[in-house]
């Protein structure tokens, strides 16, 4: 078998309970939390993001956040990404599965008429959670920054 259980997104109270039951506990990461209603590009903390977004715009990247119908294209981008980066493990970043992703917010990047990247966010009642990020090797620099920024903007607009 060679498999061990893993608890993902565990809070400190649950970790303490597992420790009492002799589980080994290891902190792996912290979530980056952004409050979209307070997000503003003109703040000093985002001074390095502004040039990235300008570079994406200058490169001709167009971001689409409307309903996704190009599932075969997104699947091909996922396959290209896996060929370059290795198989998706489905741990902290999700896997490409249409039934699963069809419930997500999806932002796609297009460059010279071809889709080159996308990001997906799980939408929950009070939060959006970045899940899948994929791109081709031909993606212009700063494209992923522009995709995440478009999702933050959409979350802000949707309240």
Regions found by a protein language model. Name each.
Residues 3-31, 37-51, 55-159:
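A conserved beta-strand-loop-helix scaffold within acyl/acetyltransferase catalytic domains
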């Amino acid at each position: 078998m060679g498999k061990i259980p893993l608890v993902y997104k565990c809070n400190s109270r649950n970790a303490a309970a597992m420790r009492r039951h002799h589980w080994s506990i290891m902190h792996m990461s912290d979530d980056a939390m952004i409050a979209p209603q307070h997000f503003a590009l003109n703040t000093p903390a985002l001074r390095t993001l502004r040039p990235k977004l300008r570079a994406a715009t200058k490169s001709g990247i167009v971001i689409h956040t409307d309903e996704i119908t190009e599932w075969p294209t997104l699947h091909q981008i996922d396959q290209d990404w896996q060929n370059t980066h290795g198989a998706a493990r489905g741990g902290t970043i999700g896997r490409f599965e249409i039934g699963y992703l069809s419930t997500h917010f999806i932002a796609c990047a297009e460059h010279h008429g071809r889709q080159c990247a996308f990001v997906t966010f799980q939408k929950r009642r009070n939060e959006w959670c970045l899940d899948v990020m994929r791109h081709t090797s031909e993606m212009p620099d700063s494209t992923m920054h522009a995709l995440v920024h478009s999702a933050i903007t959409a979350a802000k607009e949707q309240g």
